[in-house]
Design a protein with these regions (language model features):
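Gly/Thr-rich phosphate-binding beta-strand-loop-beta motif of the actin/hexokinase/Hsp70
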Residues: 1-33, 65-72, 171-201, 205-211, ...
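Non-catalytic, solvent-exposed interaction/assembly segments
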Residues: 1-98, 102, 142-144
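Glycine-rich phosphate-binding loop plus the immediately following alpha-helix
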Residues: 34-41, 138-165, 197-240
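Short glycine-rich phosphate-binding loop at a beta-alpha junction
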Residues: 53, 62-74, 148, 153-157, ...
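Active-site neighborhood for divalent-cation/phosphate handling
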Residues: 71-171, 309-312
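Glycine-rich phosphate-binding/hydrolytic loop that grips phosphoryl groups
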Residues: 164, 286, 305-336
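Adenine-nucleotide phosphate-binding core of ATP-dependent small-molecule kinases
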Residues: 218-219, 229-278, 285
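Glycine-rich phosphate-binding loops at beta-strand->alpha-helix junctions
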Residues: 274-302
Length: 336
């Protein structure tokens, strides 16, 4: 693929990365002044966002215009589907039928891609073909292309966030003992069960950092900005603020922990010879104070680590500790 950079356009921030082998040659992050995802912005807000990104590209002195951009998981349909063993034409028909039942958009307004993950070599009983399917509403992909064209960039590819996360963490993933990538964003949280080159399951929870900040704001009667600062400073530390912050955030984190346990148990039941061995935290929520020890205690035999896509890379020192917020944009910047 020709040289390009990756851009991750989130509802609260925009991240840009250009990577050249082991070197990060350009990196930047700015706040999204609208605080919205692209699909609920007015035309004026889209133009203002495009101007923001133009200035961002100019500031980091990016020479090329080719870009690969992500579409948030909340705006796409992505799922692993299982079908009886059948021919490729039959499989294509079965996937189309399944999508027609599952996706709340007319078939002519959805762009679909799929890849066979696992196909039995021999049919013994009720073996299934495992297929990873992604469907993007055409209005969504059109909106992202139009925004990038407003910025005068050349979109080479749009993709959901999961492939970028897998590429970013490929060096530490294993097909024998899969990991759960816990992508803690502002608007939502993704849980992706993955091996090195294989996805076993993906789940999206419609709550993230914004929900936790609002809980803190309500509990302590604070403005949202101050609540965000409190959340970052004290987090899940039981010995801070007499444990009050811990008590506010605990139900949210317990919910996450419960989902992780369900995923791990379901995988173990299906793969007797293997087990989930690690949770990789990424996204802005990965920095929550006290999160790792709390999850480690809750999950018992599963290791919990912060995933750093910048590990082993040459990157500007001021961004070195911010790897988790750049995971998607870094994954987008890597050649397929």
């Amino acid at each position: 693929m020709p040289a390009h950079f990756g851009i991750d356009i989130g509802s609260t921030s925009i991240k840009i990365i250009k990577s050249e082998g082991k070197k990060i040659s350009a990196v930047s992050v700015i706040s999204n002044a609208t605080g919205k995802n692209l699909m609920v912005m007015s035309n004026a807000e889209k133009i203002a966002l495009a101007d923001q990104i133009k200035e961002m590209v100019k500031t980091v002195n990016l020479k090329g215009k080719r870009v690969v951009a992500s579409i948030p998981e909340s705006l796409v349909f992505s799922r692993i589907m299982k079908f009886p063993v059948m021919s490729s034409p039959e499989l294509a028909t079965a996937i189309k039928w399944e999508l027609d039942q599952s996706v709340p958009f007319p078939p002519n307004e959805v762009e679909t891609s799929w890849a066979v993950l696992e196909k039995p070599n021999k049919i013994k009983g009720d073996e299934k073909i495992s297929v990873y399917v992604v469907a993007v509403p055409t209005p969504v992909s059109d909106a992202y292309v139009q925004l990038l064209e407003l910025v005068e960039l050349e979109p080479m590819r749009l993709e959901n966030e999961i492939p970028a996360l897998m590429r970013a963490f490929s060096p530490i993933l294993s097909n024998d003992s899969p990991s759960i990538i816990l992508d803690m964003g502002a608007s939502g949280t993704g849980l992706i069960l993955v091996g090195k080159e294989k996805i076993f399951g993906n789940y999206y929870l419609p709550f993230g950092g914004i929900v936790m900040t609002k809980l803190v704001a309500d509990a302590f009667s604070l403005p949202v900005g101050q609540a965000e600062s409190y959340k970052r400073t004290y987090g899940m530390a039981k010995d801070q603020l007499e444990g009050k912050m811990f008590s506010v955030l605990k139900p949210v984190i317990d919910n996450l922990s419960g989902e992780i346990k369900k995923i791990a148990i379901a995988y173990q039941n299906e793969h007797k010879e293997s087990s989930v061995n690690r949770v990789i935290l990424t996204g802005g929520g990965a920095y929550l104070n006290g999160l790792i020890p709390y999850l480690t205690e809750s999950l018992e035999r599963i290791e919990v680590v912060i995933g750093d896509p910048f590990s082993g890379l040459n990157v500007d020192q001021k961004y070195k500790s911010l790897g988790p917020i750049f995971t998607v944009s870094y994954g987008l910047s890597i050649d397929i």
